[in-house]
């Protein structure tokens, strides 16, 4: 279930203020954030945000196509290493 249209998109206030300051000054610095729940706003286009995945920060370069999505969608939290392969023991038992 999505967020009510009446409320509007959620974005961390501190994160938006940092981006607005950087837009005014023209800086392009990596911004560290733990706010995976924040919605990507049009003001964020062209900035690199380091989104926390629970272990480390993953750099995410924001493009136009990402507007409206959540920051957490671009920083996966689980690493899939694949299922166990066939071992010699199981093949010999047959």
From Swiss-Prot:
GO terms for cellular component: cytoplasm; small ribosomal subunit. Keywords: Ribonucleoprotein, Ribosomal protein, RNA-binding, rRNA-binding. Pfam families: Ribosomal_S19. GO terms for biological process: ribosomal small subunit assembly; translation. PROSITE patterns: RIBOSOMAL_S19. The keyword Signal does not apply. Gene3D superfamilies: 30s Ribosomal Protein S19, Chain A (3.30.860.10). The keyword RNA-binding applies. One of its GO terms (molecular function) is rRNA binding. SUPFAM superfamilies: Ribosomal protein S19. Belongs to the universal ribosomal protein uS19 family. HAMAP family: Ribosomal_uS19. Protein S19 forms a complex with S13 that binds strongly to the 16S ribosomal RNA. This is Small ribosomal subunit protein uS19. It comes from Syntrophomonas wolfei subsp. wolfei (strain DSM 2245B / Goettingen).
């Amino acid at each position: 279930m999505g967020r009510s249209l009446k409320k509007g998109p959620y974005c961390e206030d501190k994160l938006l203020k940092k981006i607005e300051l950087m837009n005014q000054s023209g800086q392009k610095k990596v911004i560290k954030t733990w706010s995976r729940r924040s919605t990507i706003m049009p003001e964020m286009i062209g900035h690199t945000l380091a989104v926390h995945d629970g272990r480390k920060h993953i750099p995410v370069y924001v493009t136009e196509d990402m507007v409206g999505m959540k920051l957490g969608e671009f920083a996966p939290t689980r690493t899939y290493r694949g299922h166990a392969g066939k071992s010699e023991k199981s093949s010999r038992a047959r």
